[in-house]
């Protein structure tokens, strides 16, 4: 792991905040601990899960909805 995902995500959040966005929503595969961990470390919080909403390689997947309110992210620093 070389931190490219974290760099991309933090850059996206910085740009969203600079552009006047209030928040950002991510939809990720719920069982992906690494993706959830990355998003949580960048200020996202889990706000809901849709069960068996998508299929991949012949199996049903849950989708996690994560939200980052940018003003809360800024106050963490």
Where are these regions (language model features)?
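A short, internal acetyl-CoA/4′-phosphopantetheine-binding micro-motif in the GNAT/acyltransferase core
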Residues: 1, 28-29
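Conserved acetyl-CoA-binding loop-helix of GNAT-fold acetyltransferases
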Residues: 1-18, 23, 36-41
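Acetyl-CoA-dependent GNAT
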Residues: 9, 69-73
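Conserved catalytic-core motifs of GNAT/GCN5-like acyltransferases
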Residues: 25-28, 36, 40, 45-62, ...
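Flexible, glycine-/basic-rich loop-and-beta segments that form/coincide
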Residues: 76-77
């Amino acid at each position: 792991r070389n931190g490219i995902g974290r760099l991309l995500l933090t850059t996206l959040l910085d740009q969203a905040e600079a552009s006047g966005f209030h928040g950002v929503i991510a939809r990720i595969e719920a069982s992906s601990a690494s993706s959830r961990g990355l998003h949580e470390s960048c200020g996202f919080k889990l706000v809901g899960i849709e069960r068996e909403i998508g299929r991949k390689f012949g199996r049903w997947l849950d989708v996690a909805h994560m939200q980052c309110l940018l003003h809360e992210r800024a106050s963490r620093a």
